[in-house]
Design a protein with these regions (language model features):
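Patatin-like phospholipase
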Residues: 1-43, 53-310
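Gly/Ala-rich beta-loop-alpha elbow adjacent to hydrolase catalytic centers
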Residues: 44, 48
C-alpha cells in the first residue's frame, strides 16, 4: 500500500465582485472537497473578504465541512435580504433568462441619483442591510483566535489613498464593512479615527501579505473581474462598466508584476530564500463565462443566479 502523500499547503487570495463572489464560493467548495490541499492563509477584498472570513471561521471551528456549510449559509442570507431590495430584474429579463439589472427602472434611477447625490445626502440613516448580516453571522472571536490560519482583509484609506490590510486579531464587523464599502452607495466606514472605502481600489485581492507573512510558496488567486473584453464599449453605460472592471483589476495587475520582478531578482541575484521567498502564483478564473454578465448583475443576489455562479 502506497503511503499517503502529505497535503499540499496553499494560500488563497479572493477578489471582490458583489454577487459575483458566489463564483468564488463555488471554487472554495471544490477546493475544500480536495483533501490533497491544506489552506493556510487567506486574503480577500469586499465579497472576497466575506468569503475569506467565513472560510477561516469554518476551518477553525469545524474543519472543511463546517467551512462549506458557513459559506452556503452566508450566501443564502445575502440572497434572502436581497429579496427586499427595490432593485430587481424586470419581468422581460426573467423571461429572456438575463441576469442583468440594466433594464430595471429602479436600478436606472439609482444610477442617476448616485451621479447627483452622495450617500451622505441620500442615505441619511446610513442603512446597509449587509451590516446586519455581517454583525450577526460571523464569530470574530473564533476568526481572530484561528492559530492555524492567517486572514488578511484589504480596505482603502480615504485620507491617505493607501491600502489598509486588517489582520488577526483586528478582524471585526467594521473591518469587513470597510473592505466592502462602495463610496457611491455607502458612507465611509470609520475605524480608530480613519475612514475607509472598498479595498478593491488598492488591493483586489492583496497578495503580498500572503507572500510576506506565511511560509507557503503557492498562492491561488480566485479572479472574478475579467481582464479582457472583446467588444469595444461605445455607450456611456458600457464605458462606465468597463472602467469599473479595469479599476478593480489594476491593483491585482500591479501586484502580479511586482511578484514577477521579485522572482526574477531572486533567480538572477541569488538572494537567500530565507529572506525572499520565490512565490508561485496560480490563478483560477472563468473569464469566458464572467464576460457574459454586466456589472449591474453584481447587485443581483437572487438565489438561482448565485447557484448558477456557484
Amino acid at each position: 500500500m502506497m503511503p499517503r502523500k502529505e497535503a499540499k499547503r496553499i494560500d488563497i487570495a479572493l477578489q471582490g465582485g458583489g454577487a459575483h463572489g458566489a463564483f468564488t464560493w463555488g471554487v472554495l467548495d471544490r477546493l475544500l472537497d480536495d483533501d490533497r490541499l491544506e489552506i493556510v492563509g487567506v486574503s480577500g477584498t469586499s465579497a472576497g473578504a466575506m468569503n475569506a472570513t467565513a472560510l477561516i471561521q469554518g476551518l477553525a471551528s469545524g474543519g472543511r465541512a463546517a467551512a462549506q456549510a458557513l459559506l452556503r449559509d452566508f450566501w443564502s442570507q445575502v440572497s434572502a435580504a436581497a429579496r427586499l431590495s427595490p432593485i430587481q430584474r424586470t419581468f422581460f429579463d426573467m423571461l429572456a433568462g438575463r441576469w442583468s439589472l440594466d433594464l430595471s427602472p429602479s436600478f436606472v434611477v439609482s444610477q442617476q441619483l448616485q451621479r447627483m447625490f452622495s450617500p451622505y445626502q441620500l442615505n441619511l440613516l446610513d442603512i446597509n442591510p449587509l451590516r446586519d448580516i455581517v454583525a450577526a453571522f460571523y464569530d470574530f472571536d473564533i476568526v481572530n483566535r484561528a492559530e492555524d490560519h492567517k486572514l488578511f482583509l484589504s480596505a482603502t484609506n480615504v485620507r491617505t489613498g493607501l491600502p489598509k490590510v486588517f489582520r488577526q486579531p483586528e478582524i471585526s464587523a467594521d473591518a469587513l464593512m470597510a473592505s466592502a464599502c462602495l463610496p457611491f452607495l455607502f458612507r465611509a466606514v470609520e475605524i480608530d479615527g480613519e475612514a475607509y472605502w472598498d479595498g478593491g481600489y488598492m488591493g483586489n485581492p492583496p497578495l503580498f501579505p500572503l507572500i510576506d507573512e506565511t511560509d507557503v510558496r503557492d498562492t491561488v488567486i480566485i479572479q472574478i473581474n475579467p481582464f479582457e473584453r472583446r467588444e469595444l464599449p461605445k455607450t456611456a453605460y458600457e464605458i462606465e462598466n468597463r472602467l469599473n472592471e479595469i479599476t478593480f483589476n489594476a491593483s491585482l495587475i500591479k501586484e502580479l508584476r511586482a511578484a514577477y520582478f521579485l522572482a526574477e531578482i531572486i533567480r538572477h541575484e541569488g538572494l537567500e530564500r530565507e529572506a525572499y521567498r520565490d512565490a508561485r502564483l496560480h490563478r483560477i478564473e472563468a473569464q469566458q463565462e464572467m464576460r457574459k454578465f454586466s456589472v449591474s448583475s453584481k447587485l443581483n443576489a437572487e438565489w438561482p443566479f448565485l447557484e448558477h455562479l456557484h
